[in-house]
UniProtKB/Swiss-Prot annotation, chains A, B:
Its EC number is 6.1.1.21. The gene is hisS. Keywords: Aminoacyl-tRNA synthetase, ATP-binding, Cytoplasm, Ligase, Nucleotide-binding, Protein biosynthesis. The keyword Protein biosynthesis applies. Pfam families: HGTP_anticodon (PF03129), tRNA-synt_His (PF13393). It comes from Thermobifida fusca (strain YX). InterPro entries: aa-tRNA-synth_II (IPR006195), aa-tRNA-synth_II/BPL/LPL (IPR045864), Anticodon-bd (IPR004154), Anticodon-bd_dom_sf (IPR036621), His-tRNA-ligase (IPR015807), HisRS-like_core (IPR041715), HisRS/HisZ (IPR004516). SUPFAM superfamilies: Class II aaRS ABD-related, Class II aaRS and biotin synthetases. One of its GO terms (molecular function) is histidine-tRNA ligase activity. This is Histidine--tRNA ligase. It is found in: Cytoplasm. CDD domains: HisRS-like_core. GO terms for biological process: histidyl-tRNA aminoacylation.
Amino acid sequence: MSEQRIIRPTPISGFPEWTPRIRSVELRWLDHIRRGFERYGFSSVETPSVEVLDVLLSKGETSQEIYTLQRLQADADDSSDARLGLHFDLTVPFARYVAQHFNDLVFPFKRYQIQRVWRGERPQEGRFREFTQCDIDVINVDRIPLHFDAELPRIVHEVLTGLDIPAWTLNINNRKVLQGFYEGLGITDPLAVIRAVDKLHKIGADAVREILIDQAGLSSDQAAACLELAEIRGSDTTVVDAVAKLGVSHPTLTAGLDELGEVLDELSDLPSGSVVADLSIARGLDYYTGTVYEATFNDDPGYGSICAGGRYENLAGQFIRRSLPGVGISIGLTRIFAKLVSEGRITGGRFCPTDVLVVLPSDERRSAALAVAAQLRERGFNTEVYHQAAKIGKQIQYAVKKDIPFVWFPPFDDGRPHEVKNLATGEQVEADPASWNG
Amino acid sequence: MSEQRIIRPTPISGFPEWTPRIRSVELRWLDHIRRGFERYGFSSVETPSVEVLDVLLSKGETSQEIYTLQRLQADADDSSDARLGLHFDLTVPFARYVAQHFNDLVFPFKRYQIQRVWRGERPQEGRFREFTQCDIDVINVDRIPLHFDAELPRIVHEVLTGLDIPAWTLNINNRKVLQGFYEGLGITDPLAVIRAVDKLHKIGADAVREILIDQAGLSSDQAAACLELAEIRGSDTTVVDAVAKLGVSHPTLTAGLDELGEVLDELSDLPSGSVVADLSIARGLDYYTGTVYEATFNDDPGYGSICAGGRYENLAGQFIRRSLPGVGISIGLTRIFAKLVSEGRITGGRFCPTDVLVVLPSDERRSAALAVAAQLRERGFNTEVYHQAAKIGKQIQYAVKKDIPFVWFPPFDDGRPHEVKNLATGEQVEADPASWNG
C-alpha cells in the first residue's frame, strides 16, 4: 500500500450521484420516459452541453446562473473559449437547434430531449447544480394547432402514471385568460400582474395583493378581482362558466377561455383530478403566450413544480427570421427522483442486471461454464460466470449480494445434468440451457 | 416577424451535434452497446460531469486539457466553485466513485459507464472537445483474476461486431512482456522505452530508434532488439514462441508471456484476426501494469485508437487505503461514429420513431382517430395522429417525409372498415386495430 497522500472523496453539493441500486431505478425511469415519448412519435435530439454565451443570453438578462468554461491550461492571451457556457435548460438549445437545422427538419417537428443541464445556483432542497430534464416540444412554421396543447399533458400523464411516485396534479391555465381578464379590468401592464400572481403559492394572497396595489398600481377592487380569478379551479369546462360569472369581458379573455375549454375537453377522458384547470398558474417566463402547465406533488405543493411548460409564439425568433410557434413541457426528472430517494421512497432496484450466475465448478471446467453462459446470453439472459474456482457457498453468496435471481450449476462431472437454483424460492431443479425459461 | 437582431447559429468546433436521422442511429448504437454490457452483468454507473480539481489532477500533471467551471454572475470574492472541472475521461471519476462508495459496492465490481467527457484540446480530425465514451471496468479488492482480461475483449468484440462499422482489430499486449524484455536486455528505465515504442505507429521505426538511443541511452543492439520485439504479431500463442526465439530471459517477461498466452487461449474461439497479440502496443499511460488493449480500423490505422484500455494495479490508491486492482476498456463512441458520419458511411435512420400515422379524416372524427392511436400504442406501435384536418395527400406526404412506414385510415363514414397503407409497398388493405401486426 503506497504512502501517497490520500484525497478523501466527498460528494459535491448540488451534483447528485447514485449508488448502483439507486442508479438502476433511475435508468428504468429514463427508459420508461423515453419510451413514453417515442410512443407518440417524438424524435430524439441531443445538443452539446455548451452554447455560445450570446445564445444563452439571447432572451435578455437571465436569472439562471450560467456556468462558463475556461481551459485550465489556457494561455493568458487565449480567449477562444471565453464565450462558452453550459446550458441551463433545454429550451434555448432547442430553439437554436431548430433555427440552425431548419432545412433538415420536418414540421410540425416533435422532439424529445433528455439531458443534463447546469445552474450555478446555491444548492438547496430540490435545487441542483447539475440535473436531468426530460423535455418534449412541438414546433411548427407559422401556426401550431391547439391539439398539441392537449397532447403534451396526455403524454406527461401517461409517463408519470407509469412511475411509482406520490400523487401529483398537472395544472393548466392559459395566459390569454389572465391577460384578457386583466385588460378587461382596465389594467395597463398585465405582465406585471402575471409575475405577481405567479408568486401566489409561495408568498400567499395578502403579499400578492400588496405587490399588485403598491408596485403594479392596481386599485384594491382590481387586485381583489385578480385574486378571485386565481381561486378558480376545476377539472372540466365548468371553470369557464366560473370565470364568466366574474363579469369581466375582453376578446383576449374569450379567446383564452375557448382554448382552455377545448384543451380540457380533449383531456376529459383522463382520470378526474389528474389534469386540472387552475387559474392561479401563471409561469413567470415572458415567452409563454397561451396554455401554461405546472405539475406539483399533492402532498407537498411547496416543493415546487415537477413539470412545467407552455405555448410560445416565437421562441426561435432571435435565431431565424421565421415565425416558429410551439408548445413544450419539461419533466424535472432529478427534482422528482432525488426527493423520493432522500425521503426513502426509492430504496433501489437490483445491484446489477445479471439474471443468471453460472457457477465455476473448477478451473478445468471453465470453458464448459463459459459455453453455458454464452448460450444463455444468446437466449436473452444477462449472464455472469463466477470469476474463479471457489467454494460453491461463496459463489452463491456473491449472487445473493448482487441480487442475481438465479444460480446455474453446469455439470460437475461428465454426463450429469445442468441444474438451476432460484434464490428467491430456494428451489433447485434440473434444466436445459437450450430451453430453460427463467 | 420581429425586427430584433438575429444571432445566426453556427456549429461550435469540437462539439458534435446531429440531425434527427443521424441521431436515431447514434441512439441505436448506444442501446446496442449498453445491452452488450448488461448481457455480461455490468452495473450502470453515472458520475457528475464535474470533479473537484484535486481529483482530476490526482494522477499528477495531466496532458489532458481540463475545462474548469466559473459562474458567470459570480461575486468577485466568491471562490466556492473555483475548484470544479469537467471530467476528461471516465476512469478517474470511476476510481473516485469506488473509493467514495466502497462500502456500498459488491466486489469484484463490474460497472459500465456511458457518458460525455470534455477536453479543451484544439479540435482536429477525430479529436473532439465533447465526446461520448463507453467504458467497462472490473475492479476488485487485492487481486483481480486474469479471466477478466479475456472477458473484456470478448465483450468489445461482440459489441463492435453488432455495429455496422469498417473492419477493425483489437490488439493486445502485456506490459510485463515489454518491461521484462527490456530489463532482460539490461535496460534500466523500461518506462522510457515503453513511451518511445508507444509512438511507433505515429513516427515510425527510425524515429523511435533515434529516441531510444539518443534520449533513453540504449545501445544500438538494445534498440534493435526492442524494435524486433515490436514487430511480433499473431492471433494465437505462437507469438509466445516468437518472443522466446529472441533469446531474452527475465522472470517478468516469463510472467507476462504466461498471462498473454492465457488470455489469447481463452479468446481462441473468436474469429481469426479480430483479436491479435501485437507486441508494439504499449499504451503511454503510466498506470497500466499488465494486459493492454488498443483497437484501430484496419483501413485507417493512422486515425488512432477507437478502443483502449488495460490492467492497472491500484487505480484508486490516491483516494483510499485499499489495494484495488482492475482491468478496463473504453469504446470511443464519438470518435468512431463521427468518422463514419463525415465519410458518408452513416447516412441516417428514420427521422422519427413513429410506426403508424393515423389520418385525421375531419375535425368531427378526431376522437375516433385518437382512440385508434391509443389502441395501437397500447399494442406497442409508436403512433401519431395527423395534427389537423387536411387533404389526405398532404397527410400521407407528412408520413413520407418523416419516414413513417404505415398510414392508418380510420373509417371516414360510420360502419366502414379501417384500412392501412404500407408506404414501402404502396399496398393498402383493410385492418383491425385490435389485431393488425404491422
